Amino acid sequence: MPSFTRLIVVQVVVIFTAVLYNFFTKFFDNTVCSKDPPITLKFDEQHVYSWDDTCQLYSLDYKEARGKFQAATRLYENVETFSFPVAIDSSNEPLTIDVAIFPGNTPEYGTIVHSSGLHGVEGYAGSAIQLALLQKDVLPLSENNRPTIIFLHALNPVGMQEHRRSNENNVDLNRNSIHGNMEDFVNHRDPNIANYESFRRFLHPTDPDGFLIESPWYRTVGMWINLLPLLYQYGFVALKRAMVSGQYHDPRGIFYGGNELQPSLQHVQNFWDQRPDLFRDSPSLVWIDIHTGLGPFGKDSIHYYPSFPNETISRFPQTPAELQSQYFLTSHSVTMSVKEGETSDTFVGYDLSKGLMTSYFAEVYNSSGIFLAQEFGTLPAFLVGRGLVLDNMLYQETKQREKKAGDGGITQSGDSDRQDYSYRSPYLSKVFFPQSTTWRASVVKRGVALMLQSLDLSTKTKT
């Protein structure tokens, strides 16, 4: 590229980036939670809910979130609580998935599952919604007149602690729930099925000495220059598809789906198998999995997988189209996807994605149910992508330095089961957990509304 043309390209990228960041600063008041204004949710004429300070619902680290969740569940007398250990940190503290089961009339009203933290850092939003729901005046107190309610808190505790989406093995847990033999799937999956390798120089640039990730020039300008020719050749949707489809051949890359089932998901699948009374034998099941990142700022998009194996015995007799208008729109959601091929702009590019957790359970469930991901928007998609690329570069460089130092992140005692887990992503917190009073309030209101709508639907559609 001629030097004059290169200079023009650089200037355009710099100006564009500056304008974009200036535009989106209005969404980020950068107020770390100390005291938020009260918020009110009017669900219907009889049910109005309020929270004096949403900051009390949010946490800044995993251990704080876990402590708040456990304290909230202890306020109830008849609740079954337990934890699945996933890892142990250097201070001998367990990093766990915490489970709370609020018993209900399962044979008549079914089961509702609410999960947070599958993507680690995104769990701070899900945890806040769960705490808001656990206030005494929100959940129906009569066990005979409600479904069984299950909260799964921090499905990816290591990612939540490290402020990353991936887990302790750099695996994206929402690409890891593969049906059948995973080894066969990995061996037969084309590594470039979604053009991941075509975008490699942007998604996973060669940076052997950590020069690029430490360069302000690369982080603000250079990476865009790296990307522009690829965007010109393939387009933005192709870039998004290359990222979100997941890949199974590069353990150091982004959206890595792994080559074996990860401990977190093994715990959840075992829980499913061991409690048929709550899952397999339940006449209906609604599963809400909370995510952040895609879509309009502070608003929720719904990606759902209806399970209607036998319409004649369906718990939810509505067609997917009727559910779309009667169920999801009343939950304040702005976009939704019924199945592959019928997708909103938020979920464009996911047609090749495999291993999604809600999709997995929708397929193994043998009755009628609704399995959905509720996604709260933060930044524009390409800025989310920027954060993911930079975080992975820094994380891999950090791990490489630890390896060269000879400790590999293992504690001084040499116990391979106890890891440091001291990495904290400086990029993904802002991308997936923006410090904004507006965003915090919107997430709580919309997250609670969807859960209440699910409860309402379950009790109105009993057999």
Model-predicted regions and their roles:
Residues 2-463:
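Structured catalytic-domain cores with a bias toward divalent-metal coordination
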